[in-house]
Amino acid sequence: MREILDGRLRRQLNILEILWNTEWITTAELAEKIDSSEKTIRNDLSQVNEMIEPLSIETSFRAGIILKKDITTPKSFIYSKILEKSLEYTLLETIFLGKVTSKEELSDLLYISETQVSRVINRINQEIRFFDFQITNQIKII
């Protein structure tokens, strides 16, 4: 279901997964692995570092980048932090929990336009059609 994430969050999740599974890695190596520029990687690292407390990303001019984690924090923590930032997952959760009954209510709750709600729903529907359900215009899951 990572395909539902927007491009930025998907890239940030890829960065976190790579950092979780490696020791030190340079920005250039990381950029090559995820097919992005070093500048994009540096910007993402800054944003990611803010969202993953108590974990942290440390940088060294010589060694590169490392994810500092403690043994009590499971890998699922990074996924939960990414999902917290995802408009798509927030929208899905809101619909699944039956908190809204219209696009207008959904747009008010999420502080986005109805047009953006429609775009996100269309993008989600493209991915979930393989699971034989979809979100209708009446904000129902069928």
Listing of model-derived features with the role each one plays in the protein:
Residues 1-142:
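Short, basic/aromatic recognition patches that contact phosphate-bearing ligands
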